[in-house]
Amino acid sequence: MAENLYIPEISGPLRSFMLKVPEEIQQASGIRVMGKLIKSIVFTTDICIIRNVNADAVIAVYPFTPQPIITQAIMSAADIPVFTGVGGGLTQGKRVVNLSMHAEFQGAIGVVVNAPTSNDVVRQVCDTIDIPVVVTVISEHEDIESRLEAGAKIFNVSAAGKTTNVVREIRKRHPDIPIIATGGPTSESILATIEAGANAITWTPPTNGEVFRDIMNAYRAVSYTHLRAHETD
């Protein structure tokens, strides 16, 4: 009965054009974080994309040392929950704890630490903030049990081509642990990741440049058609 429910959709003429996550992600169970059910998570720090995508949440991590001003900018623009990166690679120790506090104060729904983060730092962060700590897993050799003992609440599996296998191994040992995972580029890879046990899927959107390229190509095609029609007349 529930599968056949009609879902009304409201949009406006100016904002009807947006990026949409793959529909296959809706088959995931989702993770309920602070009362919000999250299935699709867009992987971006681009506020233009964040404001024009139908994902349930954002995972805002980037390959530089985290800066509070960046978190503040994303949080002020986002209209969906944000998981924000607080370091763990280049950034370690007390700074990770301080960045986590700042992220919570700014309204983040969770903080993400990278794989190199020590269990001691994970424990300090968990003891300091009230929002969940998401620990990134990049290999099947990760000591999941020690991460859980340190206080990790969610695992973010990002193991490239091995992601599905890593998710499956974690799920075998821990049936109830929340798992976010990269879904890959195809419908088949997304469904395989969900089948392996992922509760939520991260999706990498096209860049602004890629979206613009398609739009401009369409404009050029229309312009060329009009020009040819004018020449014929």
What are these language model-derived features?
Residues A78-G87, D127-T136, R173-T182:
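Short beta-strand/loop segments at the ligand-binding rim of alpha/beta enzyme cores
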Residues N98, D143-R147, T186-A198:
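Catalytic cores of alpha/beta
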Residues A108-V113, V157-T163, A198-M216:
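Glycine-rich phosphate-binding active-site loops on the catalytic face of alpha/beta enzymes
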